[in-house]
Amino acid sequence: MDDTTYKPKNILITGAAGFIASHVANRLIRNYPDYKIVVLDKLDYCSDLKNLDPSFSSPNFKFVKGDIASDDLVNYLLITENIDTIMHFAAQTHVDNSFGNSFEFTKNNIYGTHVLLEACKVTGQIRRFIHVSTDEVYGETDEDAAVGNHEASQLLPTNPYSATKAGAEMLVMAYGRSYGLPVITTRGNNVYGPNQFPEKMIPKFILLAMSGKPLPIHGDGSNVRSYLYCEDVAEAFEVVLHKGEIGHVYNVGTKRERRVIDVARDICKLFGKDPESSIQFVENRPFNDQRYFLDDQKLKKLGWQERTNWEDGLKKTMDWYTQNPEWWGDVSGALLPHPRMLMMPGGRLSDGSSEKKDVSSNTVQTFTVVTPKNGDSGDKASLKFLIYGKTGWLGGLLGKLCEKQGITYEYGKGRLEDRASLVADIRSIKPTHVFNAAGLTGRPNVDWCESHKPETIRVNVAGTLTLADVCRENDLLMMNFATGCIFEYDATHPEGSGIGFKEEDKPNFFGSFYSKTKAMVEELLREFDNVCTLRVRMPISSDLNNPRNFITKISRYNKVVDIPNSMTVLDELLPISIEMAKRNLRGIWNFTNPGVVSHNEILEMYKNYIEPGFKWSNFTVEEQAKVIVAARSNNEMDGSKLSKEFPEMLSIKESLLKYVFEPNKRT
């Protein structure tokens, strides 16, 4: 190194268990034994400690699990480790996910960056802050542009992900100008190579080709991207670290462009597959920019150059994935043509460590994505469910379903309102997902809750929120079985209109204390991005002897109110809840079969299939109110969101016939 070269002493690398940053960290550890490297990573779904295996034995390496959004932790690390250089890679990066969870991108990419910058300002010891951004902040490049975006080009982001990265850049620039922080920004194009989580196209296509599955291309495949091999990118950051000028921006890219269709064809050729039969064109994404193109001259003037050609880089990448097929565990959710929010990798434990598996080097993982009808999806051995509600109806059925599907599960021993016991469960069981099927509905019915309000609050509100928060702290998805009995027909959703209540609608039924608590906790759970809320209504199963079964209930009543309602056939929808967990789906879902069925229609089916001599009589809602303590919810739920995700789901009447009445037919 010459006299003008910057030489750091103690480097903090954020997000270093992720793809690009792990290659950078491993390279610096390998090439500079006199540098102390501290890496900080919260270990989310696309990062893994195994990515840093080459560095763990080095005396100048230290790993810290934590979130850049924790200002206390960041300040503590800067001071105690005497950090003089930060290489900030940590970010949410998958564009598709940013459309369904943009607030999480804002939290990670903007707020997290702000925390780091403020810590740098307060400690006053940072000599270099290298902020890693993306070429997507420039926006879409004109198709006929002969010159790529240079570092002074206007920022015109087109999606939530790139908008958060551009926002973070503005903060970096402001802290550089306002407080004199020694900042450098990089903007990179697409990177590929070993260790990359298969939400990105190249590893996704390789894994699909390995398992003989079609390669899904959005639109016509004419979109153009530039690709750099990961080791070339790691070298670029090595150059920027030592030779980059404070206050400058550097594009990390290549002028060699490739159409998506050509990338898919090249991967097919590597596997000896016919591209025409192996490539499947699927519906395009509405936010799929046509082209990103960078000018790469500024970085080259520092002495960097691309070393790995496309053919060699792709071959190295393919070889790595075929030799490490289980690196990421169950990635079936990521391999879907249109994945929603991606799952936690199967090998991830709640404490951030990874399960070690003995996999021979020539093993090829077969990845399967099966619809809920088959009740089988992905690598079941990598899943482990923690279920609360062992003694309840839904909890018991979930356990039986896991046994049937070969999924490892355990019931939680802790009580929902006891935080310490929940933490102990997660530490000992180390689940990949948590299912909450616990709750107080009242025995024999919701009238019980009217005289047991403290107990109902303790479990339905305080307990559920406690479990959600413990899961959040451990980066776990919580599948929460809730209720749709928080709505009632009204002027905008009249009975018989076919207009159902949607997921975003706010509760309008508070006739029972049970419903009040469920409405309250649902509203609060909206603030937890790790929760999937399933609104169950009047649950039904093929077990007609179970007193919790809605059909069993009304068949034992002397009189029933004949009114149409949305309902949940558990035999069909409980397997869907497991599939939703595998797909890492979040937010609120109306968990009912499409359509409505009246109580008289159900009892007519019961008479035709089960008990020919069965008789019943009706009474009005007003007459019913005289013999019950709390009012009952009647409504229609809009099932379009769930139906779009699972188009094979049957309507309520079809599902009743297939799963309940046909199997129990006695006449």
From Swiss-Prot:
Residues where substrate binds: 134
Tissue-specific expression: Expressed in roots, stems, leaves, seedlings, inflorescence tips, and siliques.
Keyword Zinc applies: no
Outcome reported for the amino acid change (mutating residue 518 to A): No effect on dehydratase activity
Enzyme Commission identifier(s): 4.2.1.76, 1.1.1.-, 5.1.3.-
Catalytic activity entry: UDP-alpha-D-glucose = UDP-4-dehydro-6-deoxy-alpha-D-glucose + H2O
Keyword list, A-Z: Isomerase, Lyase, Multifunctional enzyme, NAD, NADP, Oxidoreductase
Protein name in the entry: Trifunctional UDP-glucose 4,6-dehydratase/UDP-4-keto-6-deoxy-D-glucose 3,5-epimerase/UDP-4-keto-L-rhamnose-reductase RHM2
Naturally occurring in which organism (per UniProt): Arabidopsis thaliana (Mouse-ear cress)
